[in-house]
């Protein structure tokens, strides 16, 4: 009996261990966590030397620590440390063999440090400091996919805007332009000739033309009426922008920005709505997110309108929410290793076992009319989706078998069982049967009618009871919807092209359909 109790206790511990670890990570392995003894860590970036050896740079409380990741003895050891002003916020970027570092500390002579990395792994050294036009910077950025000789500093004391520095001569950086809208810019994202400036205390992100860096020009704003816009990254094709907000409970928003005159928020993402999405970084079809208390998150954006989390490593053991956990992440090493700055644990290095999401696109249609069913519920596990105006619900996950409960007003519910395969897109049409008890056609004909038919411009409808009226095309797509009380009403059809349509009246218990012909 004692042996049995001991076995059960050990089994319980084993199951608890695997349960706990299942919550800590998915498809991501921690290679190393290096705490050099500083009390705080923040920004991080990477460098690859001419021999292909990889390095990680991380902002520590008292300076910038540099680690050699390809040390032959297998240890990721610190090979250089460049002191700087003591701060909780130190940000880094790298262009060619120079690192550029800013700190959010005023009244220092190290507003932007320039560090030569060319002699690594033997040593690195500070070669210049820039303080001509600002004395602190909260964030420094570059065009991640173009090593053009420019850096962009945000959150300075002098303008609160974005300072553009030419670092062609890293010993003598020169400010060539400033985007100064008159309000605070917290961070920015740069791609080609576009600057996305995050106006933290204003309602949105400024999109700025920087083709002439001496004269940054405001183009338009991506709205965010709730403010706290923090950072962003653009998909590789330039069609979508992922915008993060530095506020607990705010999801990242994915915007379709192809047409500045028709901006559309197409999806949102969060790993936990009690936490905030801090900094996103795009690489290929994936966005790598420093998610504060939720750690590193990797999201498949092969279809940006259906973002799917495919990997994570939770770095923080405490409760969700607030300004703890993972500050930064950097996925740009050729080896595929990912590094990040964890606020209290230091440099973290991961390997990711790449997996792509599969997606399913479900359309609900009416069995009687073949028209799409909108505002229907599609419930998959803990996810609850609403069908759009064309009856579509879209969902994704890693490989597996799933079940969806489908519910729509005036239709019998259905359960849909389906499988998802990695990197596959499947379309499923679900036909729902009406739950409305049919009334004899002769009675419906007396209840609803319209004339003339065919018509050129308008029709007169006669209804003995209130109904929702719809005009559908012959494929069942809803073109017009309007609610009318009982009585006689005029419906203007001038904007419809000539053709054959279906006119439909829907009440709580009945649905009436009739063919309608529109002529020129």
Please tell me what each predicted stretch does:
Residues 1-25, 439:
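Bacterial Sec-dependent N-terminal signal peptides
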Residues 9, 398-401, 405-408, 413, ...:
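C-terminal outer-membrane/trafficking sorting elements
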Residues 22-368:
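Feature marking well-ordered beta-strand scaffolds used for ligand recognition
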Residues 350-369, 431-451, 520:
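Residue-level detector of functionally pivotal "anchor" positions at catalytic/ligand-binding pockets or at interdomain
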Residues 369-374, 382-397:
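Short, acidic Ser/Thr/Gly-rich low-complexity loop/linker segments typical of extracellular
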Residues 376-380, 469:
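Hydrophobic beta-strand segments
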Residues 386-392, 425, 484-488:
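Short, solvent-exposed loop/turn segments in extracellular or other extracytoplasmic domains
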Residues 409-433, 518-520:
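Structured interaction patches on ligand/partner-binding surfaces of diverse proteins
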């Amino acid at each position: 009996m004692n042996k049995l109790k001991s076995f059960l206790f050990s089994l319980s511990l084993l199951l608890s261990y695997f349960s706990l670890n299942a919550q800590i990570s998915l498809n991501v392995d921690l290679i190393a966590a290096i705490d050099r003894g500083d009390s705080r860590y923040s920004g991080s970036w990477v460098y690859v030397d001419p021999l292909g050896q990889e390095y990680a740079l991380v902002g520590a409380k008292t300076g910038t620590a540099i680690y050699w990741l390809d040390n032959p003895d297998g240890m990721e050891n610190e090979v250089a440390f460049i002191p700087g002003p003591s701060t909780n916020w130190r940000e880094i970027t790298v262009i060619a063999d120079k690192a550029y570092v800013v700190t959010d500390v005023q009244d220092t002579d190290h507003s932007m440090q320039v560090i030569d990395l060319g002699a690594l792994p033997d040593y690195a050294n500070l070669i210049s400091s820039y303080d001509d036009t600002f004395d602190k910077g909260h964030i420094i950025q570059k065009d991640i996919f173009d090593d053009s000789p420019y850096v962009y500093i945000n959150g300075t004391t002098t303008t609160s805007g974005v300072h553009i520095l030419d670092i062609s001569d890293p010993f003598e950086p020169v400010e060539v332009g400033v985007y100064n809208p008159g309000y605070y810019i917290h961070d920015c994202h740069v791609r080609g000739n576009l600057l996305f400036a995050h106006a933290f205390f204003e309602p949105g992100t400024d999109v700025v033309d920087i083709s002439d860096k001496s004269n940054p020009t405001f183009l338009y704003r991506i709205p965010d009426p709730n403010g706290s816009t923090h950072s962003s990254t653009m998909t590789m094709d330039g069609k979508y922008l992922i915008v993060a907000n530095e506020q607990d409970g705010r999801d990242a928003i994915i915007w379709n920005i192809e047409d500045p005159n028709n901006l559309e928020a197409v999806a949102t993402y969060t790993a936990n709505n009690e936490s905030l999405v801090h900094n996103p970084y795009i690489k290929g079809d994936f966005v790598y997110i420093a998610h504060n208390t939720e750690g590193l998150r990797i999201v498949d954006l092969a279809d940006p309108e259906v973002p799917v989390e495919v990997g994570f490593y939770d770095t923080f053991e405490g409760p969700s929410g607030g300004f703890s956990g993972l500050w930064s992440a950097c996925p740009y090493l050729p080896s595929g290793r990912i590094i990040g700055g964890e606020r209290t644990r230091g440099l973290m290095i991961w390997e990711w076992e790449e997996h792509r999401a599969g997606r399913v696109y479900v359309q609900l249609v009416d069995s009687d009319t073949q028209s799409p069913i909108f505002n229907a519920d599609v419930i998959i596990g803990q996810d609850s989706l609403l069908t759009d105006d064309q009856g579509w619900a879209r969902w994704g996950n890693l490989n597996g078998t799933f079940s969806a409960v489908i519910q729509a007003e005036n239709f019998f519910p259905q359960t849909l069982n389906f499988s998802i395969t990695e990197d596959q897109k499947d379309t499923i049409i679900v036909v729902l049967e009406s739950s409305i008890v049919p009334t004899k056609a002769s009675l419906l004909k007396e209840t609803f009618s319209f004339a003339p038919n065919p018509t050129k411009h308008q029709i007169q409808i006669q209804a003995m009871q209130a109904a929702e009226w719809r005009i559908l095309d012959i494929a069942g797509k809803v073109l017009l919807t309007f609610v009318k009380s009982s009585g006689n009403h005029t419906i203007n059809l001038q904007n419809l092209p000539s053709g054959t349509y279906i006119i439909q009246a829907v009440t709580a218990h009945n649905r009436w359909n009739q063919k309608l012909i529109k002529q020129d």
